[in-house]
Amino acid sequence: VLRLFPPLQVAEAESLRNDLVRAGPLPMFTLNKKLVKAAQAHAADIGQNKAAPGHSSTNGTNFETRMNRLGIKHCATENISISSQSILLSVILLYLDIYLPELGHRKALLNPNLRETGVGSALYGKDQYFLVQDFACTQ
């Protein structure tokens, strides 16, 4: 996939290759309707309000509270991204975690304990997309 985006041939791409080999085969995510609802609602909230990207809603509700309200009580995380080109590019950038030394997005995507997911996106400004990926262990 990185061949489709030559500017992404960066040091993080090599570390991603290594992490993918180290992780080995991972189970497929199961779509969780609650996580889809949460991810889409958060994306729409941030996008429609043109708010600064973040894990808290525009009303101040944090990620943990949003998950608890849906009955997801443990083992959950969220990735967010903004892209002006495509949703696919947003996901690739989350795996690469360019300029993010803690590699938090990548760790979430490669965590074998996170088995359920929901994804949402919304237009962010004129030509960008705000992508939200919510993950949880099997509840």
Task: Give the role of each language-model region.
Residues 1-49:
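A short alpha-helix/helix-coil micro-patch that ends at or immediately precedes a cysteine
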Residues 34-138:
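A well-ordered secondary-structure block
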